[in-house]
Structure formats: structure tokens, C-alpha cells
Amino acid sequence: MTRGKVHSLESFGLVDGPGVRYVIFLQGCPMRCQYCHNPETWTTEGGSWWSAEELFRQAYRYKNYWKKKGQAHGGITVSGGEPLLQWEFVTELFTLAKEKKVHTALDTAGSIFGASRLPMEGFERLMEVTDLILLDLKEMNPQKHKKLTGMENAPILEMARWLSDHGKEMWVRHVVVPGLTDSREELLEMKAFLDSLKTVTRVELLPYHTMGRAKWENLGIPYVLDGVPTPTEEEMKEAEALVGIPLGTVFSGFLSVPSGNTEK
């Protein structure tokens, strides 16, 4: 029985996959994104331990919300932090879910793809029980990506290609930060990359916000994006046009923020 370190749980998520989702935020992330709104999930020191079996049992209590007439089928989404750090735990959890025909989604930045702590055999096993990957594509330029996140983007792009080649459905997300991730050149480069992938069924551009700033301050971490504004509606429309999102497409505009509730 595998145990995982869980930061918090959300029983009625509406933005992390199709339908109503039971969202599990895991503890631990190797990236240090300058606009991160969940910096308290970076280390493995917080959170609480759960077995995959007890966590699935907890999530399955909400199954009646997952199959509402006239709505997309919901299910379970595992987010972070970076869930690939706990791939064995997620694999066991998703295996239990698939035994009950529950839709599974993995919200990941893909930063450790190909690394020793994520064996390829283990990743492939995880993908066998994952229906949808929510891939956070942060920045196309390698140098800017390293400055923005502290890590290289080559593994992320490689993982996206692997997912495409192996027929795994992806929703791709990109946070639009004025002056950092919104240049015309880079958004066009992103569009070209996305056009090369065969299994991307949705692209979401999310406006940068400062909802997590208080968390940085509480943790004593300098907030390096102080003074950076939230993009305007017009700037978001321009970015969407460059990436190729059809006009009139409506997305939520924000990612989930863990509440700290573990429901235990």
C-alpha cells in the first residue's frame, strides 16, 4: 500500500478538468515559479499522509456529482505541487479509480519527465490509468523559462511530444504575465508547438493574478513580481488570438487555489 503526502482537498472543483472534479493537491514541487500562487506546496514538510485506498474512498463519496445529466462527466484530478514527484501513489490511486470507471486527470508541469526520480516504466504505468493530462506550459524560450521557474523546459516539451505520440489527451494551460510570458514572438512560437501536437483538445490562457502574494509574505519569501499588473481583457484577447483560441471561447480564467482543507 502506497502513501502520499497531501496538501489539501477540494470536493467540488470546476476548473481542473471536465465536469465536477474532486481535486487532490499533493505536497512538494521542484519548480520555483515567480508567479506561483501555492508556494506552501513547494516543500515536502507540510501536508498529511494518506494511503491511496483511504483517499479514493474519501473522493468516491462525491461520485453522485460526477455524472449529472446534461453535464460533462466529472471525476478525480490530482494536482500539486508537482504530482509526478509521487507517481507511485498517483498510479495506485488512479488504478482504484479506473476499477470504478472514474475519469482521471493529472495536472502537471512535466518538469521531471525523463529524470531518475520518474522512471520511464513508472510514467508509462501512470499514463495507462490517466485519461487526461492538464499540462502547464509556462514559457517557450529556454533562458526565460529557467529564470521564471528555476528549471529547464526541455523535459516539459519532450513530455508533450511523448503524450501526443502515444495518443494521450491534453489540455494545455499558459499563464499570461505582462512583460514576461506574453510577447508576440513567444506566443506565436507556442502556437506553432501546439499545432505540432496531435492530442491537444483545449488551450487555456490564464491571466496572471496576485492572489498568492500573501502566502509568499507569510512564508518570508520576497515576491519578485511586485508591481506587475494583471493583464487587461484586451491584452488577453490579443494573446488568445496569437495562440489561436477562437473568439467567443469562454474559460474560467483562474486555476484552483488550495484551501488547506484535508477533510480528515
Task: Tell where the protein language model's regions lie, with residue ranges.
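Conserved AdoMet/S-adenosylmethionine-binding subsite of the radical SAM
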Residues: 60-75, 84-211, 217-218
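N-terminal [4Fe-4S]-dependent radical SAM core
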Residues: 1-26, 30-46, 61-70, 262
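Short glycine-enriched, charge-decorated loop/helix-capping segments at active-site entrances
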Residues: 40-44, 146-152, 220-228
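Short, well-ordered coil loops that connect the C-terminus of an alpha-helix to the N-terminus
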Residues: 31, 35, 151, 199-200, ...
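Auxiliary Fe-S-binding modules of radical SAM enzymes
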Residues: 1-15, 176-264
